[in-house]
Amino acid sequence: MKVLLINGSPRKEGNTYTALSETARQLEKNGIEAEILWIGTKAVRGCIACGKCRELGKNRCVFDDDITNTVIEKMETCDAIILGAPVYYGQPAAQAMALQQRMLYAGGQAFQGKPAAVVTV
């Protein structure tokens, strides 16, 4: 089994990383492979609801200029997903929200049947 942990904090080794690292450590202690992917300072374009991802049916966003399609590819090869993000002004960090919206719309098929969790700090 493999779990993808996505660190949506702009601080590479901040509190979100600490929480995800401890989660990964516990998973690995139980024989579960864990990968932490940091997206924090990478540009993530917001979804414009153009619908092209649904038309093409390939679990990909037509905008291939950020990390979204890379994350979707990793999601396809994992068995569970954990998204971690800090909370700023009552909401998760902007990069994490934009990524979540794009992943769910463009890569929704990659999520089906997979457990998912969110860690906020």
PLM feature segments, named:
Residues 2-32:
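N-terminal beta1-alpha1 ligand-phosphate binding loop
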Residues 13-16, 57, 91-92:
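Glycine/Thr-rich phosphate-binding loops of Rossmann-like dinucleotide-binding domains
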Residues 18-21, 50-52, 95-99:
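Short, glycine/charged-enriched secondary-structure capping and boundary segments
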Residues 25, 35, 70-73:
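Short amphipathic alpha-helices and their capping/turn segments at secondary-structure boundaries
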Residues 32-42:
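A short beta-strand-loop structural module common to alpha/beta enzyme folds
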Residues 42-75:
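Cysteine-cluster motifs in flexible loop/terminal segments that predominantly coordinate metals
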Residues 62-121:
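Helix-loop-strand module that forms the ligand-binding subsite of alpha/beta enzymes
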